[in-house]
Amino acid sequence: MREYSSRPIKQMNAAWLVGQYNVRMTTITPAEVRFEGGVLRAPAFDDVYHSADGGIAQSTNVFLSGNALPERWLNQLSFQILETGFGIGLNFLVAWNAWRNTVHNPDARLHFVSLEKFPLNHADLTQVLAPYTTLSPLSEALLVAWPPLVAGFHQLKFEEGRVTLTLILGDIQETLPQLTMAADAIFLDGFSPEKNPQMWDDWVIRHLARQTMYRGTLATWCVAGAVRRCLEAHGFTVQRRPGFGRKRERLEGRFDRIPEDAFRRMVTTSRNPVLARIYHQPVAPRRAMIIGAGVAGCLMAERLAQQGWQIDLFDRHAGPAEEASGNPAGILRPVLSRDDNLASRLGRAAFFQTLQTLQRLQARTGTIRHKQSGVLVLAQDETQAALQRNVIGHHGYPQDYVRFLEPDEAQTLSGIAVNWGCWYFPQGGWLDPGSLCAAALSAGAARIQSHWQTPVARIEKTGSWRVLDARGQCLAEAPILILALGAHAENLPQTAELTITLFRGQITQIAHDPFPPQTPVLCQDGYVIPGLESGLCIGATYDNDLEAEPRHASTLENMERLKRLVPDWAPDLLPTMDRVGFRSVCRDRMPLVGALSPEDGLYSVMGMGSRGLIWSSMAAELIAAELAGTPLPLEKDLIRAISPGRFSDSGVRPHADASSA
């Protein structure tokens, strides 16, 4: 049901800034490391990162051989490894190197998930990995992708997406329950139980078992009796094996102490959709239909196409990005909050995912118009400046993610007078949504069939999903249907009960751009994007009506925004063009991403509001992972927070066959 909000816009924006959810935030402290006798040590734990007899050899003998690798992955299209303790990344690099040397099927995928509380900073990791010259091409790629050290899931892709590292930063007691995967192999690593007992306790082993495939394997250098008994208590059969180097013994395990039918029943009630898909859902033809070719729909199509799906993409317009995604530029930046609420955590994860997607698609096509100019979020007064300082200090964010600039620093960077300081996001910038859509469709062109000027009037489920035109003619059918309808969610009864509010937004363009070439994007109560070929872009209004044509009052409102940011320049700048789009906003300001009806194969990537450029890439990754039965790229509570069924106990249950409203 489409709604128009009666709440004041200022009140709604304040709610969006503060957020509705309080969560626990883990500040990430980089590891302190030093070499002693040629071996890397962690002084905080008084322990070594690897055996004195060789790190690569230890990874190969203990973790690869201990899990019967590479033999077990040779005939697998997807293989999932879960590691406790990323350390310096040797286990990942050794596994990746072995996989690329033994697996030659271009459709095969390696998924490596690793949890780490104290990651190395980029400089230390560079120094530590330098001696491992046989792994240099891989370690260099890892260093290029190494993220800012902030809490959460960081999904890094290599080998054109054939290898995925999900690096989870935070305390294992907080992060492991948030993970959803089906591990074929576990690398049980970490500092010794005497030095770091919480990495090896009963609670951790129990949660590892919940993420493991039936007959999945486990390997560790640790043979402590308490660890062995925990593993056996939670379903693993374990055996001692000859150890590596000076270590006399090691352990190998297999998750098979319960009957397989009992495991299947456990999967049914475990709420682990990855295990459930692998064990209970028949393999269907990898065909999907997507309705809507804005940013969300195009990125969804590309992600599935890269995983081997055949896609039919429908849109009522003559090409992609004709509605809200048709603005000349949008802003790339995360959202911060004092309590690190769900919106902030989702925005952070999605921001990093979007940067990865941009890098990947730009390397493939070279056609995306985008500039990593940085983004300044300017405080409006001293009170807000104090809040900005407080947020960064409270969470201990690293400077390569965000930092607070004092007024003189901000003025030097931006070239404008700054009164109170600002947040500065150095990895932020602007992006042309239309060029992103075109690049996504180009990258997936071999498997994407685009149907332009093809409105979908109705959808129905008769075995597979079918999309029909206004005459009732079937346009295509597939087992999976994904709705990326933007402002048109009300047009189908299957989405009519999703309460979505539309907000009009008008932007204004100015042909003359007086800003220096390196000026960052400027944000306050609105934004100014400099550096475009078409000049300046200013926006955007937030209106409670559906007037599709530009209006003079909205132009004046945008010009006032410009005047507040650059009062000395604004009188000389004249508007040259305006454009109107509509944001589709859910009532809690979070998107609608996931299964509308999981047993029926109906999915949503809607309700993106003003954050479609940031959220769409993560939405595509999440749904693609759910469909493939691979590790999910988001924490469980974030997945619940964006689920279309979150507003009712029973979730959304669409009609199987219904005519359009």
Explain the meaning of each model-derived region.
Residues D261-V283, M289-Q307, R316, A324-I331, ...:
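Active-site substrate-recognition segment that forms the wall
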Residues D572-A661:
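C-terminal catalytic lobe of FAD-dependent flavoproteins
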Residues Q127-L176:
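S-adenosyl-L-methionine
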Residues R471-I480:
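Core beta-strand elements of the Rossmann-like FAD/NAD(P) dinucleotide-binding domain
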Residues R24-Q80, W96-T134, G645:
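Rossmann-like AdoMet
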Residues W423-T462, I480:
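Helical element adjacent to the flavin cofactor pocket in flavoenzyme catalytic cores
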Residues S136-L138, R338-D339, T367-V377, Y401, ...:
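Helix-loop-beta segment of a Rossmann-like dinucleotide-binding subdomain
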Residues I331-L413:
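Dinucleotide-binding Rossmann-like beta1-alpha1 core, especially the glycine-rich loop
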